[in-house]
Regions:
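Heptad-repeat amphipathic alpha-helical coiled-coil interaction surface used
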Residues: 31, 38, 45, 61, ...
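Long amphipathic alpha-helical segments
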Residues: 77-78, 122, 141-150
Length: 150
């Protein structure tokens, strides 16, 4: 087990199972998910059947990138610098924009609900609230577009 000076965060992965990870790893895991979401967003953008969803996916990619950058920088201001090899995207299995945005929503809500309550994390919580707002905005925009189901 990795020793840490910081408290550990409980992540509920299911009703029966709880996994203990360090606060640092909690944030790194989510930043890795965001990295994977950026890759999936670009793949869906390139395979878009129509221009409308193509454009919205490109716009949403910028939203994800800006959010990830903000969270990563805030994390380092609180918990210290991360090593240059810790970010590795977690692969998304979504094959269309609707499934993708729902996957992003679920992961982000889970992250938000487990952010530590210490005052130093209020900026991350606030940024995540704005990101959740953007997720619902783009969910609506994706729903009114032509998408391809695989």
């Amino acid at each position: 087990m990795i020793d840490t000076l910081f408290s550990e965060v409980n992540i509920n992965t299911s009703k029966e199972e709880t996994t203990q990870i360090s606060t640092e790893q909690f944030f790194i895991n989510f930043i890795n998910k965001l990295e994977g979401f950026k890759t999936k967003c670009k793949n869906l953008h390139w395979s878009a059947p129509k221009k409308n969803i193509h454009v919205y996916l490109d716009d949403f990619l910028s939203v994800i990138s800006d959010y990830q950058d903000s969270i990563a920088e805030d994390y380092q201001g609180i918990l210290g610098h991360m090593n240059p090899n810790v970010i590795e995207g977690v692969k998304s299995q979504s094959l269309n924009a609707i499934d993708f945005i729902n996957e992003v929503k679920i992961a982000t809500e889970t992250f938000y609900n487990n952010i530590p309550s210490d005052t130093c994390y209020v900026g991350i919580k606030s940024e995540t609230e704005t990101f959740i707002h953007n997720i619902f905005k783009y969910k609506y925009l994706f729903e009114i577009c032509d998408i391809r189901s695989y």
